[in-house]
């Protein structure tokens, strides 16, 4: 799952997907429904109105829809072990996959990449509340595209209404499945202390620090190279080793699905 201001084809995610597929995993990547992309233009943010109406519970519901879609799609029956599903989330989606893993018994293991530990402390959740409530919207400038990206007050209201469900600490403490935490020691977007909190809340988790890695493990968008950065390659190899130690049977190799592109 992609993070805040992200999308499934950002940077080197396609190379990451290929690496998992080549490792004999059926790998699905998708865009959250309100990430700002469209079916015709899934890269970048042509639909800022949708972006402004996104929230955490919509992302949880989107992930639920993808899990259900996998479960009922007959063409996957011979390829996917529905009793052995793993989730991987980057940044904000690290919190999303932890919450969903705690809710859904179909999930058997989870990996968080530069994952957040507390939605209540993210600037997208709080910020200048008085001005946000007064204006009904606040804007964040995208450093790459230079777009002024709206965040409607519904984002905050939805968080307040669903605080119990959106409690990452509680979900992590209750987690009964294997959890791999991966974080870069040069991450300035989600600091190392957030990874340390996740480890503290789940002492059974596996904790891997990638030396010299920033928030996106030293890849960027666009990524025109044919190979991953050294740091992202370490993320992939660590993740594959984690999965393969835990999974007793593998599904059909070389399968990647962009499910947002399919009806």
Segments predicted by a language model, with ranges:
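Catalytic active-site module of serine/aspartate enzymes centered on a nucleophile-bearing elbow/loop
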Residues: 213-263
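Alpha/beta-hydrolase fold nucleophile elbow
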Residues: 76-90
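Alpha/beta-hydrolase active-site loop
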Residues: 49-78
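Hydrolase active-site cap/lid region
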Residues: 103-154
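Acidic catalytic loop of the alpha/beta-hydrolase fold
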Residues: 186-190, 215
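Short alpha-helix in the alpha/beta-hydrolase fold that links the catalytic acid
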Residues: 13, 177, 190-200, 222
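Short beta-strand/loop motif that positions the catalytic acidic residue
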Residues: 174-176, 181-183, 187
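Short, surface-exposed "cap/lid" segments of acyl-processing enzymes
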Residues: 1-36
């Amino acid at each position: 799952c992609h993070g805040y201001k992200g999308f499934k084809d950002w940077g080197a995610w396609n190379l990451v997907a290929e690496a998992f597929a080549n490792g004999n995993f059926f790998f699905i990547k998708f865009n959250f429904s309100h990430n700002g992309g469209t079916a015709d233009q899934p890269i970048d943010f042509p639909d800022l109105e949708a972006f402004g109406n996104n929230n955490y519970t919509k992302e949880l519901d989107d992930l639920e829809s993808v899990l259900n879609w996998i479960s009922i799609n007959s063409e996957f029956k011979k390829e996917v072990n529905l009793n052995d599903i793993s989730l991987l989330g980057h940044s904000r989606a690290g919190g999303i996959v932890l919450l969903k893993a705690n809710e859904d018994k179909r999930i058997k293991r989870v990996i968080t990449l530069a994952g957040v530990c507390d939605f209540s402390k993210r600037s997208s959740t709080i910020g200048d509340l008085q001005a946000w409530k007064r204006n009904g919207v606040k804007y964040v400038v995208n450093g790459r595209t230079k777009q002024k990206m709206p965040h409607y007050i519904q984002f905050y209201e939805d968080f307040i209404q669903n605080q119990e469900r959106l409690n990452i600490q509680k979900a992590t403490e209750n987690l009964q499945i294997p959890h791999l935490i991966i974080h870069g020691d040069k991450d300035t977007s989600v600091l190392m202390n957030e990874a340390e909190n996740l480890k503290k809340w789940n002492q059974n988790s596996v904790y891997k620090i990638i030396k010299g890695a920033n928030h996106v493990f030293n890849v960027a968008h666009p990524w025109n190279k044919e190979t991953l950065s050294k740091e992202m390659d370490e993320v992939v190899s660590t993740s594959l080793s984690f999965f393969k130690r835990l999974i007793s049977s593998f599904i059909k190799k070389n399968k990647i699905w962009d499910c947002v592109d399919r009806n």
